[in-house]
């Protein structure tokens, strides 16, 4: 699943090519992709003639504020890529990919396509009279952004106190911190020398400080590398992310640790593949 760096990479691409562009029309090829409104026709009608004012990211969600040429608000477009979703900026005469779910048309023969093999991705049109947080219910459950002041050491420490579940499990909880997923949880835990199985309540203050710093650092590094592509992620131009080749542990099971040479191990934890170095991340 695309995580914060991948979604931010897409957001940056959307900002460059769609802001100020007017939606001339569109079509929904897979109605289940549209989470709101219930009618795909109403979804397209709501977007018709609207202009993208800006794009923002909240956790793994993408949101664009829309406006008509009269400067009247025309609501919001929301997108969640889920496991395999891709937003591609292409020419309208380019052959339509097999798993294309939604097409939005612009001037100059350009088009924004939502391609999603697994069909878990979602899109929303939120009317001007509606609140995005009420319509896109997942927004209400998100914790602070990793780069925000709210994600302080004090907040992080207090949130982990008393929890007996593993720190890896906690990091996957979007209510704790928004946008971190399986890849960057493993990477940040390696960088902070914490075994993924360590219970939250066993962590010392300095470990929590190191982990917070590592989360921010690895997310920033991956954004700079255009995200990670291990399977489906592509940026707006269809280009793979480059962080995978830099990864410390994720996807490197059976290979030597870049720091100590010990073999990277992979286990299942809370149903997710979890990677770590037994030497650099000793058991508590």
Swiss-Prot record:
Its EC number is 3.2.2.23, 4.2.99.18. GO terms for molecular function: 8-oxo-7,8-dihydroguanine DNA N-glycosylase activity; class I DNA-(apurinic or apyrimidinic site) endonuclease activity; damaged DNA binding; zinc ion binding. It comes from Acaryochloris marina (strain MBIC 11017). Involved in base excision repair of DNA damaged by oxidation or by mutagenic agents. Acts as a DNA glycosylase that recognizes and removes damaged bases. Has a preference for oxidized purines, such as 7,8-dihydro-8-oxoguanine (8-oxoG). Has AP (apurinic/apyrimidinic) lyase activity and introduces nicks in the DNA strand. Cleaves the DNA backbone by beta-delta elimination to generate a single-strand break at the site of the removed base with both 3'- and 5'-phosphates. Keywords: DNA damage, DNA repair, DNA-binding, Glycosidase, Hydrolase, Lyase, Metal-binding, Multifunctional enzyme, Zinc, Zinc-finger. The keyword Metal-binding applies. The gene is mutM. This is Formamidopyrimidine-DNA glycosylase. It catalyses: Hydrolysis of DNA containing ring-opened 7-methylguanine residues, releasing 2,6-diamino-4-hydroxy-5-(N-methyl)formamidopyrimidine; 2'-deoxyribonucleotide-(2'-deoxyribose 5'-phosphate)-2'-deoxyribonucleotide-DNA = a 3'-end 2'-deoxyribonucleotide-(2,3-dehydro-2,3-deoxyribose 5'-phosphate)-DNA + a 5'-end 5'-phospho-2'-deoxyribonucleoside-DNA + H(+).
């Amino acid at each position: 699943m695309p995580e914060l760096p991948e979604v931010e990479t897409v957001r940056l691409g959307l900002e460059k090519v769609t802001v100020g562009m007017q939606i001339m029309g569109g079509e929904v090829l897979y109605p289940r992709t549209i989470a709101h409104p219930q009618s795909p026709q109403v979804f397209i009608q709501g977007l018709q003639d609207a202009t993208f004012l800006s794009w923002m990211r909240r956790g793994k969600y993408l949101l664009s504020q829309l406006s008509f040429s009269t400067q009247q608000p025309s609501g919001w477009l929301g997108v969640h890529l889920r496991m395999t979703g891709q937003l591609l900026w292409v020419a309208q005469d380019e052959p339509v990919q097999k798993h294309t779910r939604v097409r939005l048309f612009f001037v100059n023969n350009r088009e924004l396509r939502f391609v999603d093999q697994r069909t878990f991705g979602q899109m929303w049109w939120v009317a001007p009279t509606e609140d995005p947080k009420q319509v896109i219910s997942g927004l209400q459950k998100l914790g602070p952004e990793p780069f925000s002041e709210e994600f302080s050491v004090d907040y992080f420490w207090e949130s982990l106190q008393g929890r007996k579940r593993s720190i890896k499990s906690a990091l996957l909880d979007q209510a704790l911190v928004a946008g971190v997923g399986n890849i960057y949880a493993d990477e940040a835990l390696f960088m902070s020398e914490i075994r993924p199985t360590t219970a939250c309540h066993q962590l010392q203050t300095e470990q929590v400080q190191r982990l917070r710093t590592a989360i921010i650092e690895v997310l920033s590094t991956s954004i700079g590398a255009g995200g990670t592509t291990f399977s489906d992620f592509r940026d707006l131009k269809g280009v793979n992310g480059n962080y995978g080749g830099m990864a410390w542990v994720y996807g490197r099971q059976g290979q030597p640790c870049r720091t100590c040479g010990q073999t990277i191990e992979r286990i299942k934890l809370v149903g997710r593949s979890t990677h770590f170095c037994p030497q650099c991340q000793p058991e508590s």
